[in-house]
Amino acid sequence: MTQVIQKNWQELIKPEKLQVTAGADPKRLATVVAEPLERGFGMTLGNSLRRILLSSLQGAAVTSVHIDGVLHEFSSIPGVREDVTDIILNIKDIAIKMQGDGPKRLVAKKNGPGVLVAGDIQTVGDIQILNPHLVLCTLDEGAELRMEFTVDTGKGYVPAERNRPEDAPIGLIPIDSLYSPVRKVSYKVENTREGQILDYDKLTMQIETDGSVSAEDALAYAARILQDQLEIFVNFEEPKRESETAAIQELPFNPALLKKVDELELSVRSANCLKNDNIVYIGDLIQKSETEMLRTPNFGRKSLNEIKEVLASMGLHLGMEVPGWPPENIEELAKRFEDHY
């Protein structure tokens, strides 16, 4: 394979990292920004990921319900203010997190007067009700109600007809199931700048889930699905960059140490302290002891803990010995291996 062919994908600009901003409810809402992208890629990726998020992620939902004394969904229940049709509509809104395989059966019981909520459902094992305050129905004085739910896992939308087993007993009411843990997805594409070029794409996606999976993780799963589906279209194996691989093996230290400390997203105070102490690379930083760091002007315990936490996430710590550091051609090496840290 020639270098000219490899340029088809190697020279396209792509984001170095995603910008993820949690919403008011961090477990359910997030805004994700990817930039810069080649012109047209914002729409291509945004539309593809949105479709996968809404249709292809696994989740859990109620597939059927049996209500004592009720034969079909058009019935009414003595002492219950809502009719069965309204109760079923409420049941569809139950958000469920289920780790294992289904189907599983859950039971809810209630004596009036009072309100039956999703939290009254008696869960088992790996099942969790995520919106326990959801009202299912209201019972008057003296009313009794018992419901048995069937919960299963799946993807996308499944109509009630497909949820009816062939040997369904009398009184079993199948329910439309929306398995997708993603409730809403929107995206927009704007122009963004990279250097002197003004017409790159900026993709912004707003994602809302039911809480069984975070918005950021849901996007990661959707991207993995897309990646997996596209693999079959690649009819070649890309040769490894032998020279770079050999060079990495020759380095006497981890190439991640060539990363500059100003790329660590530290607080302004911590970053300025490192800059004033002429600490440029991670390799410079990790050779410092905690005592040495605390001697740095304006550098306190809070900054120290912040740096220790960042280094720990990379498998590093202060006070390390690095043989062969600093290399003579450190700037050249840093640029050469920036894709490997």
UniProtKB/Swiss-Prot annotation:
Region (Alpha N-terminal domain (alpha-NTD)) residue spans: 1-237
Gene Ontology molecular function terms on file: DNA binding; DNA-directed RNA polymerase activity; protein dimerization activity
Enzyme Commission code(s) on record: 2.7.7.6
UniProt region (Alpha C-terminal domain (alpha-CTD)), positions on chain: 253-341
UniProt subunit comment: Homodimer. The RNAP catalytic core consists of 2 alpha, 1 beta, 1 beta' and 1 omega subunit. When a sigma factor is associated with the core the holoenzyme is formed, which can initiate transcription.
Family to which this protein belongs: Belongs to the RNA polymerase alpha chain family.
GO cellular component: cytoplasm; DNA-directed RNA polymerase complex
Pfam families linked to this entry: RNA_pol_A_bac, RNA_pol_A_CTD, RNA_pol_L
InterPro entries: DNA-dir_RNA_pol_insert, DNA-dir_RNA_pol_RpoA/D/Rpb3, DNA-dir_RpoA, RBP11-like, RNAP_asu_C, RNApol_insert_sf
Matching CDD domains: RNAP_alpha_NTD
Keyword Cell membrane (UniProt): no
GO-annotated biological processes: DNA-templated transcription
Enzyme class: transferase
Keywords: DNA-directed RNA polymerase, Nucleotidyltransferase, Transcription, Transferase
Function: DNA-dependent RNA polymerase catalyzes the transcription of DNA into RNA using the four ribonucleoside triphosphates as substrates.
Gene3D superfamilies, sorted: 5' to 3' exonuclease, C-terminal subdomain, DNA-directed RNA polymerase, insert domain, RNA polymerase, RBP11-like subunit
UniProt-recorded name of the protein: DNA-directed RNA polymerase subunit alpha
Keyword Nucleotidyltransferase carried by entry: yes
Domain notes: The N-terminal domain is essential for RNAP assembly and basal transcription, whereas the C-terminal domain is involved in interaction with transcriptional regulators and with upstream promoter elements.
Chemical reaction(s) catalysed: RNA(n) + a ribonucleoside 5'-triphosphate = RNA(n+1) + diphosphate
